[in-house]
C-alpha cells in the first residue's frame, strides 16, 4: 500500500491530477477531500466557520484520517490517491506524520497567480472571493 498526496492551493488542479493518476495505476483508489466535506456538511455555526476557514477544519481532517484508516484496513487497493491542501501543521501532523509507516509520495502543485485567478473565476460552485483573496496569495513555488 502507498499513499500519493496531491497538495496545492485552491484552484490549482489537485482533483484533475489525482483523477489522471488513478486511471494510470491499477487498483488505485481516489479519496476526494471535497467529497468528504460534502459528507460532513456543517450542522452548526462552528462547523460552518470550519468549512469557510481552513484553520478551523480539524474535524474534517480527523474524518479524513478515519476514512484513510478504514480503506487501509479493508484492503483491496494498492494505492490511495488523495488530493488535499495540507495547509497547516495540524494537517501535516495528522495526515503525513500519522501515516509515516506507509510508503508515501507528496506532490505540491504550483501555478502562476494569474492562472490561479483565471481558474478560480471560471469554477462553478466555489467560493470565488475566498479562493482569490486567500489561497492565490498563498501560492508558494518551491525551487
Regions found by a protein language model. Give the residues of each.
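ATP-binding Walker
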Residues: 12
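P-loop (Walker A) phosphate-binding loop of NTP-binding proteins
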Residues: 9
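Hydrophobic anchor at the beta1->P-loop junction of P-loop NTPases
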Residues: 6
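Conserved substrate/cofactor phosphate-moiety recognition/catalytic segment
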Residues: 18-66
Amino acid at each position: 500500500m502507498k499513499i500519493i498526496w496531491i497538495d496545492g492551493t485552491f484552484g490549482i488542479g489537485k482533483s484533475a491530477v489525482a483523477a489522471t493518476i488513478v486511471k494510470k495505476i491499477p487498483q488505485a483508489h481516489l479519496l476526494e477531500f471535497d467529497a468528504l466535506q460534502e459528507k460532513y456538511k456543517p450542522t452548526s455555526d462552528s462547523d460552518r466557520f470550519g468549512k469557510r476557514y481552513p484553520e478551523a477544519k480539524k474535524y474534517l481532517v480527523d474524518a479524513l484520517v478515519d476514512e484513510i484508516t478504514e480503506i487501509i484496513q479493508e484492503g483491496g487497493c494498492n494505492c490511495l490517491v488523495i488530493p488535499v491542501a495540507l495547509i497547516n501543521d495540524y494537517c501535516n501532523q495528522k495526515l503525513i506524520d500519522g501515516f509515516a509507516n506507509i510508503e508515501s509520495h507528496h506532490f505540491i502543485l504550483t501555478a502562476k497567480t494569474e492562472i490561479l485567478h483565471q481558474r478560480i473565476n471560471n469554477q462553478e460552485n466555489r467560493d470565488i472571493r475566498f479562493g482569490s483573496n486567500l489561497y492565490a496569495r498563498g501560492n508558494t513555488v518551491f525551487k
